[in-house]
Amino acid sequence: MLNSDEHMEGSMGAAKIPRQLSGTEIAEIVGGEILGDPGIMIDDVDVIERATATHLSYVGDLKNISRIRNSCSRLIVVPDSVRDELVNYRDRTFILVSSPEESFLCIASMLRPCRLRSTVGISHRAVIDPSAKIGPNTNVHPLAVIGRDVVIGHSCEIQSGVVIGDGCYLGNNVLLYANTVLYHNVIIEDQVTIHASCVIGADGFGYQVVNGGHQHIPHYGTVRICSDVEIGAGTTIDRAKVGETLIGTGTRIDNLVMIGHNCRIGRHNLLVSQVGLAGSVSTGDYVVVAGQVGVADHVHLGDGVVVGAQSGVKNDIPGGQTYFGNPAGPMAEISRQLAALRRLPDMRDAVKRMERELEALRSQVADNRHTDVRPAAA
């Protein structure tokens, strides 16, 4: 293992390519059809609002096609379905494809290639217990701390300020960004990326009342992050009381998500920013939980469930359902309730109007009765 802080270019990273591409070249790369000037040259990419004349940009669908009018971009990737609309923009060159965003990102990766991975080796300014085992081609940056009996696989990246507690296991190709903390005995499988300032394996929020005070409940379990998981910055995942808190293969977790003790997250889930899962929540596969959703303890979300933003989930949701609202309910039902709620002011006015009309009718009936009374015969 290397023992220096010298930075040398490694074997990973994108190959060097020309910094300019023509319209024809881009069309060939993405398999699209070019309409306009095939010789137009671009040197960078940007979103449609900020793009300049030398930037490639894209529009994803018909409803956004009008944004082209105020853009300075001269070369724009668009879906095949908007072909008939392009006659209004004859001063631009277009590349027609089936998936504009995918094609745009393909070119972006070429014009803005990832930085080559530096070979730092094992920095002499890192603090590493002698019992730790670190695989080949792994970088441990200055000021990282690695505890007793830690095992780290090959080609990992341990950035500055990372703390890996005693007994942790990291597989191959794990990337821990700066200031991430793994408490003791956490298990991270292969191809996992954890962004800056995450905390994995802290005790859950568990207390019991003893002698009038809140006494902490020890957590003896751990956290297992399965392979091909990405976790956003500032996310926290608590260890289990016993057993494992589990994050399934292929799951993507956004920034600032909180996952409580003993949760079991299925495969290929998407958890968006500021989601909070209480203890022992479980999910199936391909579940999507939108931003700022709260899920109560022991709730299960079935396969393919989608939960809309800012929902509060208090009961299990069967697979394949889309829920939102607080308390969360089926989309169709909650949509009807919201539609009725929006009509409530008009309904209130209508009821008041009917009350006035009814009162007028009552008065009229009373007057008619009084008029119809005949004096008794002499």
Please identify what each model-predicted range represents.
Residues M1-R125, Q191, S197-C198, A202-H216, ...:
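Terminal amphipathic alpha-helical/low-complexity segments used for targeting or macromolecular assembly
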Residues Y58, G121-P330:
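Structural signal for interior beta-strand "rungs" in well-ordered beta-sheet cores
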